[in-house]
Design a protein with these regions (language model features):
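Acidic, histidine-bearing metal-coordination/catalytic regions of metal-dependent phosphoesterases
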Residues: 1-9, 14, 29-33
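Acidic/histidine-rich helix-loop elements
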Residues: 7-21, 47, 88-98, 153-156
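Active-site glycine-centered loops adjacent to acidic/histidine catalytic or metal-binding residues
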Residues: 12, 41-42, 74-75, 148, ...
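Active-site metal-binding motif and surrounding structural segment of the metallo-beta-lactamase
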Residues: 29-46, 138, 177
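Short acidic, glycine-rich surface-loop motifs adjacent to enzyme active sites
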Residues: 44, 138-155
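Extended active-site neighborhood of metal-dependent phosphoesterases/phosphodiesterases
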Residues: 50-143, 158, 166, 172-175, ...
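Histidine-centered catalytic micro-motifs
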Residues: 145-151, 177-186
Length: 186
């Protein structure tokens, strides 16, 4: 059954988690019916530091205990090239490509929408075939992609031609409605 829904999208909370906490509580007050919250990476500044994670969740108390968080890996979760503390925080779908590693990329359907969460810290090629299959095998009306590093950026040095070329072609092929990205702090 198709159920109308909304969601909240944010990214790059890592700098000033107290300020971010205020924003997320405002979003919850303004949109208490939002089905879930998507975070497009950089949830914390130091992904290998437990204190950063404690602060992240503490600042979201009253929101993430009521609404689901849909996280995406950013570069800050890869502190020391190891996102294991990020992976320890969540029980994510284990339906991503084997090449990417467990729970680093995943997809899910909600109502009449497909959400595909990608790990842009890895080469786009490692997830391209799986990404194509997710869209090809879905009958969802609405299609969303979530990843951290921007395909197009307001800063030339942050542009990601690999994401644009490889994932962008797949997004175009399946008429993806929206690509939600982070990293630019815009």
């Amino acid at each position: 059954k198709v159920v109308p829904f909304s969601f909240v999208y944010m990214g790059d909370a890592q700098n000033g988690l107290d300020r971010w906490g205020s924003l997320i509580h405002t979003a919850y007050r303004e949109r208490p019916d939002a089905a879930f919250y998507i975070m497009a990476g950089d949830l914390v500044n130091r992904g290998a530091e437990r204190n950063d994670w404690d602060s992240f969740f503490q600042n979201a108390t009253g929101v993430f205990d009521r609404r689901q968080l849909v996280p995406c890996l950013g570069n800050h979760e890869y502190q020391n090239n190891d996102p294991s503390l990020y992976l320890d925080q969540f029980a994510l779908p284990a339906n991503g490509p084997a090449e990417a590693g467990p729970e680093r990329a995943y997809s899910f359907e909600y109502s009449n929408a497909l959400f595909v969460v990608l790990d842009s810290n890895q080469l786009p090629e490692t997830q391209a075939e799986w990404l194509d299959q997710q869209f090809a095998n879905s009958k969802a009306v609405w299609k969303f992609a979530v990843y951290h590093h921007p395909a197009y950026s307001s800063s030339a040095r942050r542009d990601n031609p690999g994401v644009r070329k490889i994932w962008g072609a797949i997004f175009d092929k399946y008429h993806v409605d929206m690509a939600l990205q982070g990293h630019d702090h815009a």
